[in-house]
Amino acid sequence: MFLLSFVLEDWALHELLPLKPQRATALLLVASSYVTWTFQMHTFSNSLETIIVLWCLVLMGRMRDDREHTQVKLCMALAFLGVLGIFNRITFPVFLLVPGIRLLPDLVAKPFRLLVVLLAGSLTVLMAVATDTEYYTGSRLNFSTLFQDCILTPYNNMMYNMDSANLAQHGSHPFWQHFIANLPQLLGPAIPLLLSSSRKNILFWSGISGIAVLSCFNHQEARFLLPAVPLLLASIRLPDSSKLRQTWLGMWILFNLLAATIFGLYHQAGVLPVQDWIRQHEANNPQHVFWWKTYSPPRWLLGQANAQITTTDLMGMSGPQMMDRLSDSISCEQGTAHEVLLVAPGSATFLDEFTSTADSEASGLSFDLAFSHRQHIGLDDLDFGDDGFEPTIQRVFGRRGLDVWRVSKICPASG
C-alpha cells in the first residue's frame, strides 16, 4: 500500500490539477498528512477505495477533455475500475455522484461510449461474481449452475448495511458524526481553510457529497472518509499572507506529528500483541475468545492454535448484549467449558461494575484480569454524543490499554 499510495495517488493528483501552484500545494498537503502515513498505509478496503476514486476521476476528466473520439480503452478502464470499486466497498459510488452526473451528457452524446462501458462493466461483474462464488463456496466453478449458486457480495453487503440492527452491532453514531467529529479528526487545521477559502471545484464537491451520503448511515467511522481526504486537501488555498501561511503550516505540522503518533503508535495498537499473547498462552487450551470494541482480530496470527481457539468478534455490540453472549457461552454443566476470554479496551467503562469484586456476583459472572497491553487506544469509541467532549477524551486516553479477562460463570455449589 505504501508504493500504491505514494505513486498512484500522487500521479492522479498530478493529472487532476493541471495548474502547477495548485498541484504543488495539493501534493504537499497530501504527502504531509498523517492520514497518508497511517490509515492509507494499511491494507484497508478504504485505502484501495481512495486510489480507485482518484483514478476514476482521472479517467472521467480525460473523457471530457476529448469529446470527439469514443476512447474505447478509457471506457473499458473506467468500467473495470468502477466494478472493482463497488466490489471492494459498496459505498464507493457516493464519491463519484457529482462527476458521474457531469459525465452523463458526454456518454449520451456518444452512445457507443455508453455501450462500451456497459459491456466492459458486465464482463467485469461476471468475472468478479465467478471469483467470489468459487472463493466463498470453496468448490470448482461450474458455469451451468453459476446463476443459481452465485454469490453477489455487493448485494449481500448492501442488504446487511440496510438493516439497522446489523449496524448497531458495530456501534451507532449521530448523523453529524462525520462532519463534526470525523472530518476534523482527519483534517485538523485544514478545516478553517476548507470552509473559508477552498476552491469549489469538482474535487471539493465529490468529497463533500460523498460525506453527506455516508452521513445518512448511523455507523460512521473516520476511515470511511479516506477517499475524501485527498479530494478536499486538493481544494484548499493556503493563506495569501506570508505570516499567516507560516503560522498555519506550523500548526499543520504539529497536528500531523501528534496525530501520527496517536494513530500510528497507539490507535488499536494492542490487537496484535494481545492476539500473540493468546497464541502463546492458550495454544494448548481449547478456548473461546470474545473481542469487544476493537478492530477485527487477525485469526491467521494464531497459527496452529487457530484450530483450538474459537474467535468471536462482538464488534461494537451494546454492553448488555455482550454480557448475554458471554453468559450464554458458559455452562455450569459437567464436561462443558466453564471459562471464556474477553478482550476489551480499558476505556470500556461498562465493564467496571462487573469486574469489581463487590459487584461481580450480581451478573453471575466472574472476571479475572489475565493480561493487559498498555499501548492501546480505541479512537473508534469516541462517544461525544452521550458522554460529552471532555469526559470522552479523559476516558479514552486516561484509561488506555487492551485487557484480556478470564470470564467464568458463578455456579451453585453441587451438593
Show where each model-derived region lies.
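Transmembrane-helix signature of polytopic, membrane-embedded enzymes
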Residues: 1-4, 8-33, 205
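Transmembrane alpha-helix segments characteristic
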Residues: 30, 147-163, 197-218, 247-255
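Short acidic/glycine- and proline-prone juxtamembrane loop motifs at membrane-interface regions
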Residues: 38-48, 222
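Perimembrane helix-loop-helix junctions
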Residues: 58-86, 90-125, 234
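Membrane-interface helix-loop-helix junctions at transmembrane boundaries of multi-pass membrane enzymes
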Residues: 104-119, 192-208, 216-220
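Hydrophobic, aromatic-rich transmembrane alpha-helices
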Residues: 177-202, 211
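Catalytic lumenal/periplasmic loop and adjoining terminal transmembrane helix
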Residues: 242-414
